[in-house]
Curated annotation (Swiss-Prot):
Family: Belongs to the parvoviridae capsid protein family.
Annotated spans, Disordered: 1-37, 94-129, 163-186, 437-465
UniProt GO MF annotations: metal ion binding; structural molecule activity
Domain of life: Viruses
Comp. bias regions, Basic residues: 112-128
Residue ranges of the motif Nuclear localization signal: 4-12
Miscellaneous: VP3 might be a post-translational cleavage product of VP2 in several autonomous parvoviruses.
Name of the protein: Capsid protein VP1
GO cellular component: host cell; host cell nucleus; T=1 icosahedral viral capsid
Gene3D superfamilies documented for this protein: Parvovirus coat protein VP1/VP2
Sequence positions that bind Mg(2+): 330
Free-text comment on this protein's domains from its UniProt entry: The N-terminus of VP1 is sequestered within the mature capsid. It contains a phospholipase A2-like region and putative nuclear localization signals.
Compositionally biased tracts (Gly residues): 173-186
């Protein structure tokens, strides 16, 4: 009997059965996950060949799937295969999705109602031939920082949430740093690159998990900077030596730069009110996954004025002027999130927006000298001095990060940044200490219907259990609880540092009674037209106060301290009431200074505030880290996404003086398109209660807040994100 024919092993890598060309499809069980991905890849190629397609010279959906499945491979074969097909993706023409043997196996992707049912997602038409030619030329020249598969090249890019796996990484990746970026030409003037996309896509992954992919696009207008220099500027309320302003003190020192900051770190940049309603009503937990952004379709223009009266402005395209782009991937520069100043990109995709000027604090010494004794008539004086020479930190973008020079038609992509943050709950907690654990046993229950007929309890000195007061009275007020939900914190306290006085931040929690906003950290928002104000006039501002839904706050007007040992007299003897002064000061009461934070404190995270709230924040570089940040619910455990800076390069004239800090310049401005993708994972709400719950909705009276007026005015109201209740215990 002849021996059985040997299976073709082809050129498989050592230790693998399928990873390599020329092998048969019946080699047995794969040796590891990368080998399993290779087996599935070979089977897909076999289907292509049987259907008359040649997958070896085209980039196919099977190649894309293999890239995704080996993205985090630890074995050498998986890494080799991953980067081989990424290189193929950059240069090979692509098969259309209709040629994919796995098209019918893609999971359902539900999109927000904003997506037109008849529209096609980007990435369907063949890539222009010049894309591959330009990339090949740049590859030959050794431009190592070229991003070979940027977002704007999604004329052939698959939908990023196809298949129930992680989003495919395009361009340079970051595993927790600031992300890598690169600029390149995109075919020159007149070649359209990229798409304008503001959809929010929801992919249901099963087992209650959802991937939310938020796309944002804006047209950004950028004027050339007023100056090309860095300026250290002191700011004072008034001249030094006159009356100080105390709580209205503004004195500081800042470094003003010629650069602008593109900041998309606000909820309103990524979601519209309908998206937020869907998320807050249906999700109980959300977490950040990844972030990427891109600049494309750069247009640079110059302005000249005629000598006529009145002068006539003439606008011309400038094909040689440059837009400077810098990405601080390693967070070298001072971190300056723009949301607390309401200076992020605008919230309305149909309106052009602009970046904010980049500036940062410098060390300074601020002194407020009050009178030395009560009744002294001397004014409070103020002064400001340059910080100690050992504390000065002067940064310039030009020597801190690489700078890319873009001309008309060029583009820049940051690559993908991956977050490392804790999940955020989108529910509120109603339970306080008085509602934790087992309630007391009733002595009698009511027999008549109606809340006005209560039950009764046994006498306080006959109840069983334990508490922390050394007497025989066991009441709901003295019952011991497992932990402390929330805490009392000093409020309206101004600590003092070298830089001057500052209001001690407290965790925002909703008040329990009497609308005590300040003791519970309510946040006051002030915004302009780009960020939610109704009016079309840029001179007006709108304000609102935001109280989160969490019930972990305190009612300072009803707090009291009792003497020890506990005295049960019915008078106020031994009881310190909120109205009782401390140290003879009629305006100082104990709830202003009492801090009950300790090892037993249980606390909820900072609530997200749509649309004006900041999304993520940078972790402080201290040995002892704060548990929460007031400004943002997500705190990046590693470096946050790198800050993106832009600046129009100096467009000089022939009148140049090397001894002058300011040179004559041709008036130049730029319009360019920015877009980004921010990805979340979320958990869907499950219904375990009998009663229905309150959800975010609108009424006939306030629906007008979400639609424009007859002259285009529109408003973005704050929307609560934690309406769904949850129990703590």
């Amino acid at each position: 009997m002849a021996p059985p024919a040997k299976r073709a092993r082809g050129l498989t890598l050592p230790g693998y059965k399928y990873l390599g060309p020329g092998n048969s499809l019946d080699q047995g069980e794969p040796t590891n996950p990368s080998d399993a991905a290779a087996k599935e890849h070979d089977e897909a190629y076999d289907k292509y060949i049987k259907s008359g397609k040649n997958p070896y010279f085209y980039f196919s959906a099977a190649d894309e799937k293999f890239i995704k499945e080996t993205e985090h491979a630890k074995d050498y074969g998986g890494k080799i295969g991953h980067y081989f097909f990424r290189a193929k993706r950059a240069f090979a023409p692509k098969l259309s999705e209709t040629d994919s043997p796995t098209t019918s196996q893609q999971p359902e992707v539900r999109r927000s109602p904003r997506k037109h049912p008849g529209s096609k997602p980007p990435g369907k038409r063949p890539a222009p031939r010049h894309i591959f030619i330009n990339l090949a030329k740049k590859k030959a020249k050794g431009t190592s920082n070229t991003n070979s598969n940027s977002m704007s090249e999604n004329v052939e890019q698959h939908n990023p949430i196809n298949a129930g796996t992680e989003l495919s990484a395009t361009g340079n990746e970051s595993g927790g740093g600031g992300g890598g970026g690169g600029g390149r030409g995109a075919g020159g003037v007149g070649v359209s690159t990229g798409t304008f996309n503001n959809q929010t896509e929801f992919q249901y992954l099963g087992e209650g998990l959802v991937r939310i992919t938020a796309h944002a696009s804006r047209l950004i207008h950028l004027n050339m900077p007023e100056h090309e220099t860095y300026k250290r500027i002191h700011v004072l309320n008034s001249e030094s030596g006159v009356a100080g302003q105390m709580v209205q003190d503004d004195a500081h020192t800042q470094m003003v730069t010629p650069w602008s900051l593109i900041d998309a770190n606000a909820w309103g940049v990524w979601f519209n009110p309908a998206d937020w309603q869907l998320i807050s009503n249906n999700m109980t937990e959300i977490n950040l996954v990844s972030f990427e952004q891109e600049i494309f379709n750069v247009v640079l223009k110059t302005i000249t004025e005629s000598a006529t009266s009145p002068p006539t402005k003439i606008y011309n395209n400038d094909l040689t002027a440059s837009l400077m782009v810098a990405l601080d991937t390693n967070n070298t520069l001072p971190y300056t999130p723009a949301a607390p100043r309401s200076e992020t990109l605008g919230f309305y995709p149909w309106l052009p927006t602009k970046p904010t000027q980049y500036r940062y604090y410098l060390s300074c010494i601020r002194n407020l000298n009050p009178p030395t004794y009560t009744g002294q008539s001397q004014q409070i004086t103020d002064s400001i001095q340059t910080g100690l020479h050992s504390d000065i930190m002067f940064y310039t973008i030009e020597n801190a990060v690489p700078i890319h020079l873009l001309r008309t038609g060029d583009e820049f992509s940051t690559g993908i940044y991956h977050f490392d943050t804790k999940p955020l709950k989108l529910t509120h907690s109603w339970q306080t200490n008085r509602s934790l654990g087992l309630p007391p046993k009733l002595l009698t229950e009511p027999t008549t219907e109606g809340d006005q007929h209560p039950g009764t309890l046994p006498a306080a000195n006959t109840r069983k259990g334990y508490h922390q007061t050394i007497n025989n009275s066991y009441t709901e007020a003295t019952a011991i609880r497992p932990a402390q939900v929330g805490y009392n914190t000093p409020y309206m306290n101004f600590e003092y540092s070298n830089g001057g006085p500052f209001l001690t931040p407290i965790v925002p929690t909703a008040d329990t009674q009497y609308n005590d906003d300040e003791p519970n950290g309510a946040i006051r928002f002030t915004m302009d037209y780009q960020h939610g104000h109704l009016t079309t006039s840029s001179q007006e501002l709108e304000r609102y106060t935001f109280n989160p839904q969490s019930k972990c706050g305190r009612a300072p007007k009803q707090q009291f301290n009792q003497q020890a040992p506990l005295n049960l007299e019915n008078t106020n003897n031994g009881t310190l009431l909120p109205s009782d002064p401390i140290g003879g000061k009629s305006n100082m009461h104990f709830m202003n200074t009492l801090n009950t934070y300790g090892p037993l404190t249980a606390l909820n995270n900072t609530a997200p505030v749509f649309p004006n709230g900041q999304i993520w924040d940078k972790e402080l570089d201290t040995d002892l880290k704060p548990r929460l940040h007031v400004t943002a619910p997500f705190v990046c455990k590693n470096n946050p996404p790198g800050q993106l800076f832009v600046k129009i390069a100096p467009n000089l004239t022939d009148d140049f003086n090397a001894d002058s800090p300011q040179q004559p310049r041709i008036i130049t401005y730029s319009n360019f398109w920015w877009k980004g993708t921010l990805t979340f994972t979320a958990k869907m709400r499950s219904s375990n209660m009998w009663n229905p719950i309150q959800q975010h909705t609108t009424t006939a009276e306030n629906i007008g807040n979400y639609i424009p007026t007859n002259i285009g005015g529109i408003r973005m109201f704050p929307e609560y994100s934690q309406l769904i209740p949850r129990k703590l215990y």
